[in-house]
């Protein structure tokens, strides 16, 4: 009696433990059952797998080299039997000449139960157009960048520097060779300095400069002939024209007069004499 009661107690305890046990690792039997349930796939999943396998087989055949024999000919084409790649299965079909066939439809299909392998031309065309589109976009972007670079305005610099109207630049004259065998007249090569028009006009209007010019003009005369020039003495007087004052269009109004460190009046007179000598000899030479 004690044994039976002990067995009943053990059975109830084990049943309670299985019912109450929720924490910890699951038992092996439950794990195996769950794996079996998980391995069982739905029918829709199996159908999709079959369709994908068929599609893969069909796509694998596209683009494979074939070898075969023409079994018969007819007016619109040929009857062929070919092998695909290295497979041993023979395929037979009809090949039509260009312009002698109509697209297969329900009315003219002689074997509607035979599946047809359709070429994925749409996908190939789409991929090619996408690649072309990327290339064309890249070229357009590159062309627009080149055009934008080409349209950048470039400042044009003048070949010869311009001088403002209110400035006078003195010209250094080269020594002129006299035709009558005279010696060269020395020229004082002083550094070039720019003077404003107001200062130049003021210097030209001074009385000492005009009196000096009149004295030089009264001292000698030059005899000009068309054929030859005969000097009367070693020192020959030259005709000098009075300088004209240059009046600027827009005179510069200066608050404080700038100190002039230029040449003296004698050097300006020598320059004027040299210019006249060159002009007279140039006119006589021609």
UniProtKB/Swiss-Prot annotation:
Residues 191-204 have a biased composition (Polar residues). InterPro entries: MNM1-like. Residues 1-10, 30-39 have a biased composition (Basic and acidic residues). GO terms for molecular function: transcription cis-regulatory region binding. It comes from the Eukaryota. Residues 20-29, 131-140 have a biased composition (Basic residues). GO terms for biological process: regulation of photoperiodism, flowering. Disruption phenotype: Slightly earlier flowering time under both short and long-day conditions. Altered metabolites profile. Mailny observed in young seedlings and in emerging leaves. Residues 1-60, 123-146, 181-204 are annotated as: Disordered. Lineage-specific modulator of primary metabolism. Influences flowering time. This is Protein METABOLIC NETWORK MODULATOR 1. It comes from Arabidopsis thaliana. The lineage of its organism: Eukaryota, Viridiplantae, Streptophyta, Embryophyta, Tracheophyta. The gene is MNM1.
